[in-house]
Amino acid sequence: MSVNYKSVIAMVDDALNLVEIVEEHPCPNGSEWVIYQYQRTSPLILSAWREGNKHHFVTKIGKEKLNLVPSLSAAGIEEVYIENNRVHIVYAGLAGGGVGAELRKGAKNVLEVNILEKGGGSRLGKAEVITPKMEKVIIGIDDTDTKEEGATWVLAHEIGLEVEKEGLGYYLDHTIVQLYPGNPNKTQNCVSIALSFAVYPEYKYKLDKFIKKLLKERSLSDETAMAVYYGLFPSKSMKLFALKAKKEMVKIEEAKSIALRNNIKIIPINGEGGIIGAVAALGLAEHHSLAPKLCEDIKL
């Protein structure tokens, strides 16, 4: 078949014993069926969502037998385990739901696909997909422009592309976070940026050095700063700080306190003015519907 998944990425959080799987489906909205069926069928899956034709699954590490029923629970993930820095994902499904596992062969970042049972027609299909073990790193960036020129969101996106080009990992996401519009120190719209990456473990602590260098070279502001968070999910305290930074002025000391509590690395590039926005961006990096909103439009 010529229809293949474009990429499969598996990020592991060893402390939580969880894996986030991100797959780029070959069809524009075909991933909606996958999200619905996999979540209904798979006890291993804790949460699932779609962004365009990419689907995300957060799974436990382990094995759970699937109770496959046509139409009702037609396909899912049966097993996820880590071995020799590789993530093994076992998919199973009925009819077309079983063929999908085979179509991950040839996808970017997939090392190997082992067909366990050949699917198609009315048959059960089962396959094991193997990817490198990766980890998630989220970078908050703020204050790179001036009132005369520049745009932080554009520079951040360029940096994301440079990271992928350099081979350090995959550029997953770019989130624009609206902050307090009444800030007298703002350039104009008062936003900061969160960039999310899937990174190979050996590059985990090299990523920030690479981004720091690019910001130092390209930032136009004297107050540029970045913040680095290692993990799948920003904490509740990080989210609450970000929401507060939407509502009112906050002090740098509060941002530093949140960073200390959550093992966030703060890196001033040209100054400390951007620390608040950089830390705040991390808290809403995974909350795409909340991130761009003004405080008065958020109902929690």
Swiss-Prot record:
It comes from the Archaea. Pfam families: TiaS_TCKD. This is Uncharacterized protein MJ0921. It comes from Methanocaldococcus jannaschii (strain ATCC 43067 / DSM 2661 / JAL-1 / JCM 10045 / NBRC 100440).
